Design a protein with these regions (language model features):
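FAD-dependent oxidoreductase catalytic-site/capping-region signature
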Residues: 1-132, 136-138, 146-157
Length: 157
């Protein structure tokens, strides 16, 4: 049996930055997983809860020994250390192209990339946070809305 503990609404935020003006150079990607203490606490609580589920009498007799992080990781610090060493992203990262009017925003409210005429970002990159459920439906909605904006702007031109 397997239980995977994950933070479906993480507070941690990473960055993607250009390393150079050369567009062929790969960007610097810093996901900063678990940089928010709240994410550590969510995963710590989830790990403790998962252990209680497996220790409950109906499951205990069917459960094998815990493999990760393992029964020796009993303190909060040991569990959090394991999360930092072995944790990974299980969902779809979003929000790599901030939308808004502030100077750090990549796209404006009509999904146009600032400073590059004719280029838009019409995908999950503009979501401010990851959705609790799969990102497919909201991505389709962004695509439909973006297509409508492109048609509107073409008619107005």
């Amino acid at each position: 049996m397997t239980i995977v503990v994950c933070a479906v609404r993480p507070d941690s935020r990473g960055t993607i930055m250009a390393r150079s003006v050369d567009p062929l150079q790969p960007p610097a990607i810093r996901p900063s997983y678990l940089s928010a203490a709240s994410d550590e606490q969510v995963l710590l609580s989830g790990t403790r809860h998962a252990r209680r589920i497996f220790e409950a009498p109906p499951l205990a007799r069917h459960s094998a020994a815990e493999t990760m992080p393992g029964s020796t990781a009993s303190s909060d610090d040991a569990i959090i250390d394991f999360m930092h060493r072995a944790g990974m992203n299980l969902h779809h990262p979003v929000g790599t192209c901030r939308m808004g009017e502030d100077p750090m925003a990549v796209v404006d409210s009509r999904l146009r990339v600032r400073g590059i005429a004719g280029l838009r970002v019409v995908d999950a990159s503009v979501m401010p946070t990851v959705t609790t459920g799969n990102t497919n439906a909201p991505s389709i909605m962004i695509g439909e809305k973006g297509a409508a904006m492109i048609r509107e702007d073409a008619r107005a031109a």
